[in-house]
Design a protein with these regions (language model features):
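Flexible nucleotide-interacting loop at or near the entrance of a catalytic core
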Residues: 60-62, 178-242
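ABC ATP-binding cassette signature C-motif
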Residues: 1-187, 239-242
């Protein structure tokens, strides 16, 4: 899932994970589906890396072998399995949480910025691991190269609307550019029509017949739509300034 900062990508992941409430709508989940969520700022139930790994692994229907657990930790730069989490940096804690996510047996893996705090070798290893994964993966990432190599579909979140892009990042850029041009053209046509109807209203309606009333109603709809467009434009500008 891609989109500019502040559009609600992380919030949507939390909603899908059942961590955050949503205002309206319905989420339909397959019965028995197992979902695991990797947040940007993880929290743990124990203070020891290995204890946390063992706790997660004990809940798996088919526990992961010990050597594989240690291999995943090592690949992510965690070589002291008895490390105390409270003494770790934020980056180390995020890598431990990523290891926990990869060790968890689930149908859907939700990842929020999984490549943060990873070096190039770790990112390359993670790419190969996720490509081989049997779980469906839904992630938020700003790493376009990682995205290109791992993801098969992109969902763009823009002003509360979702747009699906099948293909790589270049396809997304092309699709978005086309959509923006179409929106500009539609907005230009709407603006011209609004100006024309505004002139008619200001000139005064000579007869209050059915046609005039219909035209007034259409003008009101145009006015409301134009107000909404201006409001959305202000929201976008405010987000960009932040």
């Amino acid at each position: 899932m891609i989109g500019v900062n502040g559009t609600g990508k992380s919030t949507l992941l939390k909603i899908l994970a059942g961590i955050e409430n949503y205002d309206s709508g319905t989420i339909i989940k397959k019965n028995g589906i197992k979902i695991h969520y990797l947040p940007q700022n993880p929290e743990f139930k124990t203070d020891c890396v290995w204890d946390e790994i063992q706790l997660v692994n004990s809940k798996n229907e088919h526990p992961v072998a010990e050597f594989e657990l240690k291999s995943i930790l090592t690949k992510l730069g965690i070589t002291d399995y008895q490390s105390t989490m409270s003494n770790m940096s934020g980056g180390q804690r995020k890598r431990v949480a990523l290891a926990l996510a990869l060790c968890t047996s689930c149908d859907l893996l939700l990842l929020d910025e999984p490549t943060n705090h990873l070096d190039n070798d770790m990112v390359e290893w993670l790419e190969n691991y996720l490509i081989r994964s049997k779980s469906a993966i839904f992630m938020v990432t700003h790493d376009r190269y990682f995205l290109d190599r791992v993801c098969t579909k992109m969902i763009e979140l823009d002003q509360g609307d979702l747009y699906i892009h099948n293909g790589n990042y270049e396809v997304y850029l092309e699709n978005k550019e086309t959509r923006i041009e179409q929106e500009k053209l539609a907005a230009h046509k709407h603006k011209n029509l609004y100006k024309k109807e505004l002139e008619w209203v200001r000139a005064g309606v000579q007869a209050r017949g059915t046609k005039s009333n219909s035209r007034l109603q259409r003008f009101e709809e145009l006015r409301q739509k134009r107000f909404k467009q201006q409001e959305e434009s202000l929201k976008i500008n405010a987000t960009m300034q932040r």
